[in-house]
Amino acid sequence: MHKESIMQPICDRELHEECGVFGVVGVPDAANLTYYGLHSLQHRGQEGCGIVSVSKEGAMRRVRGEGLVTEVFNEAKLANLAGDMAIGHVRCSTAGGGGTENIQPFLFHHNTGDFALAHNGNIVNADLLRNYLENKGSLFQSTSDSEVFAHLIKKEVRNHNRPRIYSIIEALNMLEGAFAFLVMTANRIYACRDKHGLRPLSIGKLGDGYVVSSETCAFEVVGAEFVRDVEPGEIVTIDRHGIRSSDYSMFKRHMMCAMEYIYFARPDSDIEGRNVHAFRKESGRLLYKEAPADADIVVGVPDSSLSAAMGYAEASGLPYEMGLIKNKYIGRTFIQPSQSMREKGVRMKLSSVSGIVSGQRVVLIDDSIVRGTTSRRIVRLLREAGATEVHVRIASPPFKNPCFYGVDTSTYEELLCARMSVPEACEYIGADSLAYLSPDALLKAGNRCELCMACFTGNYPTSLYGTIEEANKKEKC
């Protein structure tokens, strides 16, 4: 019999990504715009947030704190962040742990000029670089892997009397992993993306200035017009005079993280030319072709699975119904001390609509199964509401491998599909049948030649270092 942990968050189905970044150059009240931009990226991180602004005199000021954007900032705090240039960050930690000291943007003082830094992703050789830098005398303010990049920049600036962009290029070429960085100095922002293109970063035009964001959904909110994506292996220098491009790596691949399309990004965002909602809807259509079910209605798990459920319903000819309702106001990190309290917590977050599902054979569409515990609870909710059959269809391949690029799955033990076959997983979640989308269909849904699908296939686009490599080689249980 499978036993669930006694202490477990009710929102344990949710994957958490490293964060989201947003920046503004050459626009009045840049901090206010950054506030709205971060609010649009809140789904990428709820643990903490921060903004650093640059005044007309070149002075940098920072406000950061734990909680949501609306909890950390108010009019008085934003008024203290005057200037036409700012960067911001929302955080959901996957490396370095929590605590205010790990909330970005980080702010660094240097005799060549202060600079601020915000990062989305994960640096897989951070521990090796940190040890190297500490042996060279670097003192770290946090346990975040992101701070490693800043110390590499400072080291290169100290050793070479040349423009900062060259120090950034040298530092970037020492990093391995997934990253979208914003580095802000007194008069410009450098937008940098890893050479594999694992994390998104886009540039927009607003009046005489520019904005840069992890997702394009933030552009419409602030009134900006999409210009282009930052390319893999590229540094885009953005100042009050315009934008300039430099390549720091000749090796480039467009290996966007598949989970950006499947789960993390907002449906109204476009990632490398493909709308997220359209991607998910097409994945649902292809899922029906690969795994049809003899059923009466299609129900999606809110919110990230709804687009795929629409596609499955259209392809199958079955009615799409709102058989599950999500309570958006439940706390984010409830941890319940007993089984009965956990069950109440799940019912607070998700409710089944018995008038819709009672007496029906349900196709339940979800974007992914990671740990499996919440899938089992949802199947149980539908059965208790009167569903006669529950056929689970997953709009992604089986999640079998840890991610080391900014998603909080670092061991095989926590992954259901690493421990169980599909029939075993089906029995565990209590479904009548279970099927997944194939990797080929996932690529087809996005009109892509390649994506990072390491969590599905085990084919990692970068080298894995130290303890991470050893963890990856562990025998699967």
Model regions: which residues?
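Conserved short alpha-helical segments that host acidic/polar catalytic motifs at enzyme active sites
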Residues: 2-232, 237-295, 301, 389, ...
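PRPP-dependent phosphoribosyltransferase catalytic core
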Residues: 172, 187-188, 223-229, 380-477
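A conserved beta-strand->alpha-helix junction
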Residues: 73, 142, 147-151, 320-331, ...
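Short, glycine/charge-rich flexible loops or terminal/linker lids adjacent to PRPP-binding catalytic cores
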Residues: 317-362, 373, 400-407
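Flexible loop/turn segments at secondary-structure boundaries
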Residues: 29-31, 94-95, 125, 190, ...
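Extended, hydrophobic alpha-helical segments in both membrane/secreted and soluble proteins
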Residues: 298, 305-312, 316, 320, ...
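Mobile, glycine- and charge-enriched loop segments
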Residues: 351-365, 369, 394, 465-477
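Secondary-structure transition/capping motifs at alpha-helix termini
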Residues: 138, 159, 292-296, 314-321, ...
